[in-house]
Amino acid sequence: MTNIRKTHPLAKIINNTFIDLPTPSNISSWWNFGSLLGLCLIMQILTGLFLAMHYTPDTTTAFSSVTHICRDVNYGWLIRYLHANGASMFFICLYAHVGRALYYGSYTFQETWNIGILLLFTLMATAFVGYVLPWGQMSFWGATVITNLLSAIPYIGSTLVEWIWGGFSVDKATLTRFFAFHFILPFIILTLAVIHLLFLHETGSNNPTGIPSNTDKIPFHPYYTIKDTLGALILILTSLTLTLFTPDLLGDPDNYTPANPLNTPAHIKPEWYFLFAYAILRSIPNKLGGVLALLLSILVLAFIPMLHTSKQRSMMFRPFSQLLFWMLVADFLTLTWIGGQPVEHPYMLPGQLASILYFLLILVLMPTASLIENKLLKW
């Protein structure tokens, strides 16, 4: 008798995705982040669902409802902080996942890569609207500042901003619609993630060498289910450690002050995972220019497959490209640090230089290094 997992219509899909999937035998732990992102998404949807049961999307009660969750709901504090820190874990895994794709040339899977960029944008939108929900000072002012950026769009800017706000300022209508967006977007992310996986399984996974591995494949289960389980345990342990010992480490103290439209915080900044893009936005003195640079800081990923000039797929055997890649990582961290600092003397110039370097590395230096490496192959 044939095994039911290979014949049953539903079980067959699961089997071909997670059990009998032919996988390269040499993929490293950098390939764990895809499954970890799936785990993060499931954790966020579950904790978010329980939070939504007690949260009220109203300007007068939103802040108190979050306090009520933390004080009066059974393990509400745990659910709330798991959700808040889960977002940080999500972005750590995401940046590692994108970094790995850049390093090993996985972006040559064009469809998978493009869906990935779409996923990144959707995730950033979800995190942004979610940060507004507790209705603290940073929630309110973050929403005001970031939505206001749309007013830089010629002709329709101001109308667009008021349309998003649902009035003439960030108010009850804004909070209600942001809650609606924050509830629906994770399910859109889930759908996109399935499509992402679907496209990936059309081609099969890449591997550290970047060389086709069709002659050397092993079943996903038990080899990579074990490997992914270890990654999952490390993720859960890190998440719990962060949540139980330093729940507010990555948050902003200003968000413990209820939103007050009459009092602007000294330094408005988003959550840490947006700081690199925020630093790029602030490094340009012109409003429209800043908004375009902010958009391009993520959209630039879409140009990477077109800028792949190397004869090799992976950076494993390309020392110049490796050096530039790690420069890009250092630049990303520098931008993240500068985005969290006030716009004043020592930070402005390094921020502008780091922003220029960010685009220069991706658009000019890395493709040029690849061409030089191609020449060196002939030596």
UniProtKB/Swiss-Prot annotation:
Its main location: mitochondrion. Keywords: Electron transport, Heme, Iron, Membrane, Metal-binding, Mitochondrion, Mitochondrion inner membrane, Respiratory chain, Transmembrane, Transmembrane helix, Transport, Ubiquinone. One of its GO terms (molecular function) is ubiquinol-cytochrome-c reductase activity. Heme b b566 binds at H97, H196. It is found in: Mitochondrion inner membrane. One of its GO terms (biological process) is mitochondrial electron transport, ubiquinol to cytochrome c. GO terms for cellular component: mitochondrial inner membrane; respiratory chain complex III. Binds 2 heme b groups non-covalently. CDD domains: cytochrome_b_C, Cytochrome_b_N. SUPFAM superfamilies: a domain/subunit of cytochrome bc1 complex (Ubiquinol-cytochrome c reductase), Transmembrane di-heme cytochromes. Its cofactor is heme b. The chain crosses the membrane at residues 33-53, 77-98, 113-133, 178-198, 226-246, 288-308, 320-340, 347-367. The keyword Cytoplasm does not apply. Belongs to the cytochrome b family. Component of the ubiquinol-cytochrome c reductase complex (complex III or cytochrome b-c1 complex) that is part of the mitochondrial respiratory chain. The b-c1 complex mediates electron transfer from ubiquinol to cytochrome c. Contributes to the generation of a proton gradient across the mitochondrial membrane that is then used for ATP synthesis. This is Cytochrome b. It comes from Platanista minor. The lineage of its organism: Eukaryota, Metazoa, Chordata, Craniata, Vertebrata.
